[in-house]
Amino acid sequence: MSDSDNIPSRRKDDHLDIVLDRRTAPATVAAGWEYIRFEHCALPELDLTQIDLRASLLGKTMRAPLLISSMTGGVLRAEAINRHLSEAAQALGIAMCVGSQRVSLQSRNSQGLTRALRRMAPDIPLLANIGAAQLREADGLDLACRAVDALEADGLIVHLNALQEAVQPEGDRDWRGVLAQIARAARSVDVPIVAKEVGSGLSASVACALVKAGVAVIDVAGAGGTSWAAVEGERARDAADRAVAMAFADWGIPTPASVQAVRRALPTVKLIASGGIRDGVDVAKAIRLGADIAGQAAGVLRAATVSTEAVVAHFEIVIRQLAVACFCTGSADLAALRQARLLPSAHLPAG
């Protein structure tokens, strides 16, 4: 394999190192979850142990409305990370999406992104993942089908990372025709398409265009979590490249605002909120604003490098927090949580 062929793999290694390293993990704009406050119900008239957190995604029932969001898919360390995540997702009954499969599909090393993941997690919604820019390539549709087949996935995430590509020295600059290719993928791939930003959020107009093109699920992946512009700035070798990237470290639509806007424009679309989800209270707020599912990536990445048990322990806390949020709003289930009263706030993010 040539040096140029190794660039994507080295880049994924850089990304993982930066996100994991507390000294270099990029600071990001606040998502704004702290401005959203529930009206406390002092008399819930509920049994906390009977709160129903079940949700569904891609025809499968989940024990809680949680998605392990896209993380790493192209480095050698990914095999252990993805094993821990898939085993934990199966144990918890929550959904999982792998990171970009481009490297594993275009190299001889599967790096753990095989049907073995499906065998570890036979009952959960499992999503494959490729970049929108890769769909424009000559073999883009074939790559999409192979990504799904490699995992026996229930759906295919097409991630929209235009900002990251724009500030990445080796990034894909030409995004003409991407929407048309997404529409072709929606017709050609045997599973539903999930369109996902990667930290800059989706506007209502873009979400509507994606759904019109045949996308079945929207993941807003708004600002407030990992800033991939800042990550690219951290890995930049050239001062000018770093300066360009860092100017966009706080760019994007905050996740709460993106969720509200997309839900108003598309009342029935399956909607995932990710980007700055810190805990189960943020999950509850996302559900209240209109999301069906909440996703978390960087927040669980460190646990994923340790063990399956560490990932399970992490999400068990998130699930307990979500249940208490339901209890303290008088919500017996997620449908009731969507109607929970919020305190008036002048700082509620506009959507």
Curated annotation (Swiss-Prot):
Domain of life, per lineage: Bacteria
Reactions mediated catalytically: isopentenyl diphosphate = dimethylallyl diphosphate
Residues where Mg(2+) binds: E165
One Pfam family in the UniProt entry: FMN_dh
CDD domains membership: IDI-2_FMN
Main location: cytoplasm
This enzyme's EC code(s): 5.3.3.2
Subcellular location: Cytoplasm
Positions contributing to FMN binding: S69, S70, M71, T72, S100, N129, K196, T226, G276, I277, R278, A297, A298
GO cellular component: cytoplasm
Cofactor(s) recorded in Swiss-Prot or TrEMBL: FMN; NADPH; Mg(2+)
SUPFAM superfamilies per the UniProt record, alphabetical: FMN-linked oxidoreductases (SSF51395)
GO MF: FMN binding; isopentenyl-diphosphate delta-isomerase activity; magnesium ion binding; NADPH binding; oxidoreductase activity
Family: Belongs to the IPP isomerase type 2 family.
Function text: Involved in the biosynthesis of isoprenoids. Catalyzes the 1,3-allylic rearrangement of the homoallylic substrate isopentenyl (IPP) to its allylic isomer, dimethylallyl diphosphate (DMAPP).
Database matches in PANTHER family: ISOPENTENYL-DIPHOSPHATE DELTA-ISOMERASE
Name of the protein: Isopentenyl-diphosphate delta-isomerase
Gene: fni
